[in-house]
Amino acid sequence: MTNILSAIILGIIQGITEFLPISSSGHLLLFRHFINLKLSIIFDIYLHLATVLVIIIYYRKRILELFLTFIRFSLRKTVKSDLTNLKLILLILIITIVTGVVGTFISKYESMFTLSFVLINFIITGILILMLEFNFLKVDFKGNILLAGIFMGLMQGLGALPGISRSGITIFSASVIGFNRKSAFEISFLSLIPIVFGAILLKHKEFYDIFMVLNFFEINLGALVAFVVGIFSINFFFKMLNNKKLYYFSIYLFALSIIVCYFVRI
């Protein structure tokens, strides 16, 4: 398979799976396994950057609102209506810090992420989605920003494991502690923005290296495809979330795990 075709397929996979609760990292690893593709993990982060741009566009008004709130807070000119936004900013900050710590720890064990490990995590994600869909677990402490941020950060950090959906586990954790689906969706994707940019800053040297090794056109083609597909994917997921049909993703993950196990004979 040519690098151009691989970049396009990886872009499609990233664009679809970043916003659907089925684990983009798990699907990228699965695809790499079957075609024996050996690209740097930095390429995956670059694809994540493309889908983060989709989030920024989708939530541009909300992001601007939060930014203006932060400016007013910095200038000590806050108004009463800023209180909710300030709580959200603080929550996202705590989530980002905790996620970064957990994600850094997990990244040290990337060599252990085997195909069987991914498939087990697909099943775990499927179970979490079912629990989310049918409100299986509720512990309301969203009013405690510190506790809520730590809990959601820990859960989102586990999303660094391939096969565990970052969006799925974050929305699940937000729902468990009392946030409604719309708020859980918003928190999940807004908190991804600083996390991806933080990962880029931490691995800036590797980013430079990958542009020296890989074809500039191929890298950006994959990112462009991920961006375009992501625009459609995020709208599709929002509709599924509102229509309470997330269990379809559980069925998909269970079926995918069984099919791969059968053909690979794990």
Swiss-Prot record:
GO terms for biological process: cell wall organization; peptidoglycan biosynthetic process; regulation of cell shape; response to antibiotic. It is found in: Cell inner membrane. It comes from the Bacteria. It catalyses: di-trans,octa-cis-undecaprenyl diphosphate + H2O = di-trans,octa-cis-undecaprenyl phosphate + phosphate + H(+). It is an enzyme of class 3 (hydrolase). The chain crosses the membrane at residues 4-24, 39-59, 86-106, 112-132, 145-165, 182-202, 210-230, 246-266. The keyword tRNA processing does not apply. Pfam families: BacA. Keywords: Antibiotic resistance, Cell inner membrane, Cell membrane, Cell shape, Cell wall biogenesis/degradation, Hydrolase, Membrane, Peptidoglycan synthesis, Transmembrane, Transmembrane helix. The keyword Cell cycle does not apply. Its EC number is 3.6.1.27. Its main location: membrane. It is a multi-pass membrane protein. Coiled coil: none annotated. GO terms for cellular component: plasma membrane. GO terms for molecular function: undecaprenyl-diphosphatase activity. Catalyzes the dephosphorylation of undecaprenyl diphosphate (UPP). Confers resistance to bacitracin. Bacitracin is thought to be involved in the inhibition of peptidoglycan synthesis by sequestering undecaprenyl diphosphate, thereby reducing the pool of lipid carrier available. Belongs to the UppP family. PANTHER family: UNDECAPRENYL-DIPHOSPHATASE. This is Undecaprenyl-diphosphatase. The gene is uppP.
